[in-house]
């Protein structure tokens, strides 16, 4: 049996990494139509504004959002968000997150909660008109339609968030849910154990939306309203971290 050469080993390693990456990429059947838009490069929040319920726009004296060690540390101690300065439509978005330790009032001791709100329109507030890719212990992958946002689920039922409130579409295969810190879905948990990184992927084409958690389809909807807008990442009473936030343009 011949011993593989160094060049062959390098080639095989490269192929393994390529196939490993593809295996968790739900957008692999939807080729990007342009260069990646790297929203967070690990250094600063130059592509975002901040908004906090108690502090307003771009005033974060307590460092609720802090870039350190190449990741965004979200303390969760105040309700608010970082929001892209530009609007987007027709894209594949990927981001990684993991939970920290802390939970804070008014959600102290409750399931750790955050989210990625997309197609954001209207005035800066908690929370603006949008559709949410929910991030919550035991329920990551749910849809929430907020303040007039609307979506039709795979069952054909259209769900609209009332003014100033939100309405939900549960993720596919979701089991019973309990609002307690550390909760994990006993039926179909998609998250990795707390403290480990999770991959979130969002595919938006026209008014059709798909959400993936760690490579698995979590939810799907159509006739999205709005169908374009800014993208925000929440602080909602729980400590968490985000990294590697990238967006790839898609054809409609």
Model-derived features with residue positions:
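Bacterial N-terminal signal peptides
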Residues: 10-20
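Carbohydrate-interacting regions of secretory-pathway proteins
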Residues: 24-252
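N-terminal secretory signal peptides that target proteins for export/translocation
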Residues: 1-6
């Amino acid at each position: 049996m011949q011993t593989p050469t160094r060049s062959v080993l390098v080639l095989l390693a490269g192929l393994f990494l390529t196939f490993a990456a593809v295996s968790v990429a739900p957008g692999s059947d939807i080729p990007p139509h342009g260069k990646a838009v790297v929203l967070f490069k690990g250094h600063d929040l130059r592509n975002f504004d901040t908004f906090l319920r108690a502090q307003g726009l771009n005033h974060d004296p307590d460092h609720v959002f802090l870039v350190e060690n190449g990741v965004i540390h979200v303390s969760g101690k105040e309700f608010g968000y970082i929001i892209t300065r530009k609007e987007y439509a027709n894209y594949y978005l990927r981001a990684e997150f993991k939970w920290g330790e802390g939970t804070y009032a008014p959600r102290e001791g409750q399931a750790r909660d955050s989210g990625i709100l997309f197609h954001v329109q209207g005035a800066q507030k908690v929370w603006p008109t949008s559709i949410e890719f929910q991030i919550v212990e035991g329920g990551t992958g749910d849809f929430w339609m907020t303040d007039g946002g609307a979506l039709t689920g795979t069952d054909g039922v259209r769900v609209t968030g009332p003014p100033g409130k939100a309405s939900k579409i549960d993720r596919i295969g979701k089991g019973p849910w309990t609002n307690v810190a550390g909760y994990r879905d006993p039926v179909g948990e998609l998250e990795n154990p707390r403290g480990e990184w999770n991959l979130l992927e969002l595919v938006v084409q026209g008014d059709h939306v798909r959400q993936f958690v760690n490579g698995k389809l979590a939810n799907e909807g159509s006739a999205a309203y709005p169908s374009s807008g800014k993208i925000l990442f929440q602080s909602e009473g729980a400590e968490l971290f985000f990294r590697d936030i990238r967006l790839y343009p898609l054809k409609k």
